[in-house]
From Swiss-Prot:
Similarity remark: Belongs to the syntaxin family.
Function: Syntaxin that may be involved in targeting and fusion of Golgi-derived retrograde transport vesicles with the ER.
Basic and acidic residues bias (residue ranges): 168-182, 192-208
Cytoplasmic compartment residues: 1-309
GO MF term (any one): protein domain specific binding
Parts of the chain that traverse the membrane: 310-330
Name of this chain's protein: Syntaxin-18
Keywords: Coiled coil, Endoplasmic reticulum, ER-Golgi transport, Golgi apparatus, Membrane, Protein transport, Transmembrane, Transmembrane helix, Transport
Pfam families per the UniProt record, alphabetical: Syntaxin-18_N
Quaternary structure, from the entry: Component of a SNARE complex consisting of STX18, USE1L, BNIP1/SEC20L, and SEC22B. RINT1/TIP20L and ZW10 are associated with the complex through interaction with BNIP1/SEC20L. Interacts directly with USE1L and BNIP1/SEC20L.
Tissue expression profile of the protein: Ubiquitous.
Any single Gene Ontology cellular-component annotation: endoplasmic reticulum membrane
Cell compartments where the protein resides: Endoplasmic reticulum membrane; Golgi apparatus membrane
Length: 335
């Protein structure tokens, strides 16, 4: 079981500081030094990895803030009719789509480049694990931002489809309004004629007598404009046909809407799979590089073994030759 010795450590440090003061030893740049040398952090060379990783995270965060800031303007399909969100056009939305896709692709390439350089550099196992964890975190952050963008784009496409469907279902101008406008034009034309011809003002009774027969004929013609049963039946059939066409168009729009949402979901899955495949390709590349290095080391070991075996054979041959000469010398000496 672990024991807390913090108080003992502090007491020991205080004792050492008191003893150094009594002996007049300068600690931490003098008696009034800001910190002891014991607690000073050793100078550690800072690499380029941390700054580049922070830069990538900053860029991804800026993209996320931009998407959230312009979310209402981006997903709103009725900006031309609403003054509150009338600050963005369809061209600007398309430009945002293009820039966001390029930006996410660039960030993904930067992450893969950092991962490759981190594998190439020679560091301890702890530093490698730390950098791998940092890159995994950045990649997960980028995936979440990509998911946010995909959701916003799907909502925008869905609203555009709804807008087109509603525009197709708008009613045509009423015939009554046409008649009212035509009657207004007719009523305005006599007034203009009266202004242009002031001589008619001197004969109001004659004008009234001329207009009354016209009103009578108009009233008689109103009765003649009533529809016959055959015409009513024909118009009902035409209405049924139009309703059927509208229903079929509505079903097609719903199918297209579902397909668009499905395409956006598949695009998101495809993006995740592509990122996973890139990570797997990098790992396979590292394994291939490691296998190549192992093969080189094995070839060098084989060469050394061949050299050692050749030297060993030379020594054995030398020993046998010397033994043969020794036997011949002894045989000659005995004879």
């Amino acid at each position: 079981m672990a024991v807390d010795i913090t108080l003992l450590f502090r007491a020991s440090v205080k004792t050492v500081k008191t003893r150094n003061k009594a002996l007049g030893v300068a600690v931490g740049g003098g008696v009034d030094g800001s910190r002891d040398e014991l607690f000073r952090r050793s100078p550690r060379p800072k690499g380029d990895f941390s700054s580049r990783a922070r830069e990538v995270i900053s860029h991804i965060g800026k993209l996320r803030d931009f998407l959230l800031e312009h979310r209402k303007d981006y997903i709103n399909a009725y900006s031309h009719t609403m003054s509150e969100y009338g600050r963005m056009t369809d061209t600007e939305r398309d430009q945002i789509d293009q820039d966001a896709q390029i930006f996410m692709r660039t960030c993904s390439e930067a992450i893969q480049q950092l991962r490759t350089e981190a594998h190439k550099e020679i560091h301890s196992q702890q530093v490698k694990e730390h950098r791998t964890a940092v890159l995994d975190f950045i990649e997960d952050y980028l995936k979440r931002v990509c998911k946010l963008y995909s959701e916003q784009r799907a909502i925008r496409v869905k609203r555009v489809v709804d807008k087109k469907r509603l525009s197709k279902l708008e009613p045509e101008p009423n015939t009554k309004t046409r008649e009212s406008t035509s009657s207004e034009k007719v009523s305005q034309s006599p007034s203009k004629d009266s202004e242009e011809n002031p001589a008619t003002e001197e004969r109001p009774e004659k004008i009234l007598a001329e207009t009354q027969p016209e009103l009578g004929t108009w009233g008689d013609g109103k009765g003649e404009d009533e529809l016959s049963p055959e015409e009513i039946q024909m118009f009902e059939q035409e209405n049924q046909r139009l309703i059927g066409e509208m229903n079929s168009l509505f079903d097609e729009v719903r199918q297209i809407e579902g397909r668009v949402v499905e395409i956006s979901r598949l695009q998101e899955i495809f993006t995740e799979k592509v990122l996973q495949q890139e990570a797997e390709i990098d790992s396979i590349h590292q394994l291939v590089v490691g296998a190549t290095e192992n093969i080189k080391e094995g070839n060098e070991d084989i060469r050394e073994a061949i050299k050692n075996n050749a030297g060993f054979r030379v020594w054995i041959l030398f020993f046998l030759v010397m033994c043969s000469f020794s036997l011949l010398f002894l045989d000659w000496y005995d004879s």
